[in-house]
Amino acid sequence: MVTADEDAPLTQLASAQVSLANAQSKEAIYSLTTLSEQYGPSIALLNSTAAARIISGDHSGAMSNLSDALSLSGELAAPSPSLPDTYINMLSCLASTDAVKAQALLGKFSTEYPTHPYVKQMAMLDGAFDRVGAKFAV
């Protein structure tokens, strides 16, 4: 059996994802920050770090990571497949702090990514809510 090299980037990334899945945000933040410092930030690393910060309740730190991810995506020649994740994480942060900004961002996200599964699910839930609400209309 092969042992894992604890310093290998893939091992560190997998460890951070396991920590995230188990709500161990401090360990995940440490691992992801270390990876960003060693290899440079990427949109995926910044999104994962933001998710860990959201779990820990550090919404301002998460928004900082997400802003960095948006800035980084603007520097790329082609759109990043991780960009929708950045918007969804921002929505998660803003939902509890600024509902007006969250609603505006949701509108922008829905316009830019109309076929994204998140947008489709939101449209389905809006329709279901409207149908149930119509049953109770006075």
What does each model-identified segment do?
Residues 1-32:
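Amphipathic alpha-helical interface segments within eukaryotic helical scaffold
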Residues 47-85:
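Intrinsically disordered, low-complexity segments enriched in Gly and acidic/Ser/Thr residues
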Residues 69-73, 81-101, 108:
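A hydrophobic, small-residue-rich beta->alpha segment in the mid-to-C-terminal subdomain
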Residues 9-21, 46-55, 82-93, 119-135:
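"A position-specific structural signal for the A-helix of alpha-solenoid helical repeats
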Residues 23, 57, 96-100:
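Residue-level detector of the short coil/turn that links helix A to helix B
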Residues 98-138:
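Intrinsic disorder/low-complexity signal
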Residues 1-8, 32-41, 67-80, 107-116:
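Solenoid-like repeat scaffolds
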